[in-house]
Amino acid sequence: MQKFIIHKGIACPLEYANIDTDQIIPKQFLLAVSKQGFGKHLFHDLRYLDDKESVLNMDFNLNKKEYQNSSILVSFENFGSGSSREHAPWALVDYGIRAIIAPSFADIFKNNALGNGLLTIELAKDEVLEIVDELKKSQDKNIEISLLEKRVFFKDKIFSFDLDDFHRICLLEGLDNIALTLKHEAQIKAYEKNSKSFLV
């Protein structure tokens, strides 16, 4: 998992509330079990005008020239609602999204996202609206995020956010659940060696 310490990138506003996991990655693309290859299907029904993904919907912000190569999304309430599919953060990460800023996230999506290296940042609704408004009228779409400081830097404004220590450390060190377990492999083996065996 890629470390997240400081990231600066183009931010794209998605002015929708309740973006659900089926909108993020529709069910017909869930056959694969690898984390790679989902990015091209991200927001399929919003990004494309046809099922073959050959005609782009140019009214959708991610398809607009000024938001190409976006690595940060700024959206509205309850991002990631719906089913618990882990493919949703896989698709976002595979597309190149490193962070999402919103007033709130669905709990399961948030945990899945953080576990896959995708930073979820909760800001007050008025702060999100301020960022969205500035993104739409400014030529400079770049936002800087410091996970070390737990701050978002945009123009001359600084927005502070919170994140629990466990997920913050995992992101700073680039540790997913497997890597975190392996980090404590010696302690686990020592515990197993010193523990009594019981027949079940």
UniProtKB/Swiss-Prot annotation:
GO terms for cellular component: 3-isopropylmalate dehydratase complex. Belongs to the LeuD family. LeuD type 1 subfamily. This is 3-isopropylmalate dehydratase small subunit. Keywords: Amino-acid biosynthesis, Branched-chain amino acid biosynthesis, Leucine biosynthesis, Lyase. Catalyzes the isomerization between 2-isopropylmalate and 3-isopropylmalate, via the formation of 2-isopropylmaleate. InterPro entries: 3-IsopropMal_deHydase_ssu (IPR004431), Aconitase/3IPM_dehydase_swvl (IPR015928), AconitaseA/IPMdHydase_ssu_swvl (IPR000573), IPMI_Swivel (IPR033940), LeuD (IPR050075). It comes from the Bacteria. GO terms for molecular function: 3-isopropylmalate dehydratase activity. One of its GO terms (biological process) is L-leucine biosynthetic process. HAMAP family: LeuD_type1 (MF_01031). Heterodimer of LeuC and LeuD. Pfam families: Aconitase_C. Disulfide bonds: none annotated. The keyword Lyase applies. It catalyses: (2R,3S)-3-isopropylmalate = (2S)-2-isopropylmalate. Its EC number is 4.2.1.33. It is an enzyme of class 4 (lyase). SUPFAM superfamilies: LeuD/IlvD-like. NCBIfam families: leuD (TIGR00171), PRK01641.1 (NF002458). Pathway: Amino-acid biosynthesis; L-leucine biosynthesis; L-leucine from 3-methyl-2-oxobutanoate: step 2/4. It comes from Campylobacter jejuni subsp. jejuni serotype O:2 (strain ATCC 700819 / NCTC 11168).
